[in-house]
């Protein structure tokens, strides 16, 4: 109320985080909260009762209503049917998605200058890893989007190399993966996470037990799944002309397998045109100019210990500086 609305002269409205962002009807309403998302738990009938009992002044309700309606009027089209001249997934949207993927993908390692691959030297390329052929675009929670289509890494490579033989193995059979890597002129591994590993929608009993996930947190390991790390360690040395594409939204430790492969690209969640951008980068059409938004430690022991089962958290005076 004081800083946001009075000192900063903010004329919009305040809404809560999704699901349990509000924990007290009276405190939230009197503190300036105006909209509870995404299900009504503490507002609604409870808020009506709080007003009737005099615990929340009607002025708070009037202020919230004016701010919400004012915002709606400011951004509402006169004719909602004409709000979008083109459908989602139009040419402009596709071009923007491709631009974001091209500019976001980050080169982490390039031993022996493996990348870019030389197209004229590649008659056979092996693409190995479960995520190579899956549409991994991010979380399945409140941030989930539904693109018209998704270009996977495998599809992007096949489209980029129409005259080469593209061998795909999901990595579950290490002997098949080794054979594919050994006979190929180049190898692309795809490994990492999806919404089951680090999405906010994940409940504890649905999380991967290897990572110790809870609500998307990886409590027990910042590395890859055990089978993927083992795949890179065993199959990587079968071909020195190799690159790893990492999929995920946060730090992925590489210490146990990085020396087994040539190049490493961090693709994050590259979106609907991610496979196209990855293929362009692998073959030098586009420079991987993205920057890491987080630190990749060499090993997990370099990080400070975290006590996950604590009931209180204490920050010293210099926290945040």
What label would you give each PLM region?
Residues 1-9, 158, 232-240:
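Surface-exposed amphipathic alpha-helices with a cationic face
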Residues 1-60:
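Second-shell residues forming the walls of enzyme active-site clefts
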Residues 10-12, 164, 237-242, 261:
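A short helix->loop->beta-strand "cap" motif at the edges of active sites that frequently abuts
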Residues 14-16, 127, 168, 189, ...:
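Structural beta-sheet core signal
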Residues 23-24, 175-177:
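Short acidic active-site motifs
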Residues 39, 49-141, 146-154, 158-160, ...:
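Secreted, periplasmic, or luminal enzymes acting at the cell surface/secretory milieu
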Residues 136-139, 193-225:
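Glycine/threonine-rich flexible loop motifs
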Residues 184:
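An anion/phosphate-binding loop that grips the pyrophosphate of nucleotide cofactors and donors
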């Amino acid at each position: 109320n004081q800083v946001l609305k009075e000192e900063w002269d903010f004329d919009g409205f305040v809404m809560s985080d999704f699901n349990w962002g509000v924990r007290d009807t009276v405190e939230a309403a009197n503190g300036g909260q105006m909209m509870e998302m995404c299900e009504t738990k503490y507002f609604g009938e409870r808020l009506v009762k709080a007003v009737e009992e005099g615990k929340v002044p009607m002025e708070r309700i009037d202020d919230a209503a004016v701010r919400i309606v004012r915002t709606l009027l400011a951004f509402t089209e006169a004719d909602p049917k004409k709000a979008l001249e083109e459908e989602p997934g139009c040419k402009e949207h596709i071009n923007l998605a491709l631009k974001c993927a091209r500019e976001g993908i980050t080169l982490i390692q390039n031993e022996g200058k493996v990348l870019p691959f030389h197209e004229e030297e590649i008659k056979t390329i092996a693409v190995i890893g479960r995520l190579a052929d899956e549409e991994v675009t991010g979380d399945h929670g409140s941030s989930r989007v539904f693109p018209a289509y998704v270009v996977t890494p495998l599809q992007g490579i096949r489209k980029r190399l129409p005259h080469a033989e593209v061998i795909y193995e999901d990595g579950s059979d290490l002997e098949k993966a080794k054979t594919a890597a050994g006979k190929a002129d180049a190898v692309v591994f795809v490994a990492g996470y999806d919404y089951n590993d680090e999405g906010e929608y994940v409940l504890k009993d649905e999380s991967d037990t290897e990572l110790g996930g809870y609500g998307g947190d990886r409590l027990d390991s910042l590395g890859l799944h055990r089978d993927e790390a083992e795949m890179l360690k065993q199959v990587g040395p079968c071909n020195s002309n190799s690159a790893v594409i990492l999929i995920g939204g946060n730090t992925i430790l590489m210490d146990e397998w990085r020396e087994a492969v040539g190049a490493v690209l961090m693709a994050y969640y590259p979106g609907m045109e991610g496979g196209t951008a990855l293929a362009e980068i692998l073959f030098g059409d586009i420079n991987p100019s993205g920057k890491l938004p987080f630190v990749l430690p060499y090993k997990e022991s370099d990080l400070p210990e975290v006590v996950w089962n604590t009931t209180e958290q204490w920050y010293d005076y210099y926290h945040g500086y």
